[in-house]
A protein has these predicted regions:
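A short beta-strand-loop-beta hairpin characteristic of the jelly-roll/cupin
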Residues: 112, 208-213
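Short, charged beta-turn/beta-strand-edge "cap" motif at the junction between a beta-strand
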Residues: 228-232, 246-249
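Buried hydrophobic packing segments
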Residues: 39, 160, 203-210
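Catalytic-core "active-site belt" of small-molecule-metabolizing enzymes
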Residues: 2-197, 239, 247-255
Length: 255
């Protein structure tokens, strides 16, 4: 069985993977992303965007890695504000507030690195996002970055708003405060600087990470850039709200 099929089956049936045979573990990030690509086939779904895991020190500690990782957002795992998400087999059981950007032009791999200014010129719109991550590994904090790339960088469910009708381009997103809370009045506060220093820096990292690994990012794709706060513990039945101040808020329900 293809390792991506193992990951997808675990994603769907909730049976966590203890470990993979050594022969199935990739030896490089490029190999890991190449295997990750097969999730589209085994899920019988389409890729509508990308997520970045471990863009904060808290996020890196949470999954046991030293730097960010990229994962694919599947169409059937993408929701709208106020939707009800099935909690199901989610063992990670956290929610994360994130800035997301829609890409306005297809970016093919290049030998040179993109800079932040060039990347931001290609952004079509800013969006608000709540991610409910999960892992297919039982002990996700110890399996290492190559396995976590196979695991789609712990991607699971996302709720993403429409484009923000606000002149956000003039804002310093690194200083923009965010809070996320649930219906049990548990709240975590965050800030854009928690996302690799600035969500725009995180987006630039993602574009270059894909380019260096021979991956095209297509026009219209959404990139959710990573959590601005510590992951908020949640449970089935919660209403979860991420408040981005002047940019608005986004809420979802779970059951």
């Amino acid at each position: 069985m293809h390792v991506a099929e193992l990951i997808w089956n675990s994603w769907e049936n909730g049976q966590k993977i203890i470990s993979l045979p050594k022969k199935l573990i990739p030896s490089s990030r490029k190999e890991a992303y190449k295997i990750q690509e097969n999730l589209e086939k085994f899920s019988n779904d389409i890729i509508v965007g990308w997520k970045i895991a471990a863009t904060s020190k808290e996020g890196q500690k949470h999954i046991g890695v030293g730097g960010p990782l990229a994962g694919r957002i599947l169409h059937n795992k993408l929701y709208k504000p106020e939707d009800t998400l099935i909690f199901g087999h989610n063992k990670m059981a956290v929610a994360e507030p994130e800035f997301a950007f829609k890409i306005g032009k297809t970016l093919k791999p290049t030998k040179t690195l993109y800079n932040l200014e060039d990347v931001m010129k290609l952004v079509e719109s800013l969006h608000l996002s709540i991610e409910l991550p999960d892992s297919r590994f039982k002990n996700f904090a110890t399996v290492g970055e190559f396995n976590l790339i196979l695991d789609n960088a712990c991607a699971h469910q996302f709720a993403i708003s429409q484009g923000i009708d606000y002149p956000w381009q003039s804002l310093d997103l690194s200083k923009h405060k965010v809070k996320i809370y649930n219906s049990a009045n548990l709240q975590h506060d965050g800030i854009g600087a928690n996302v690799l220093g600035d969500p725009r820096i995180a987006l630039t990292w993602l574009v270059n990470e894909l380019s260096q690994n021979d991956i095209t990012i297509y026009k219209g794709m959404i990139v959710s850039t990573g959590t601005c706060s510590m992951p908020l513990p949640i449970k089935s039945g919660d209403k979860i709200t991420a408040d981005f101040g002047d940019l608005g808020s986004i809420s979802i329900n779970t059951k």
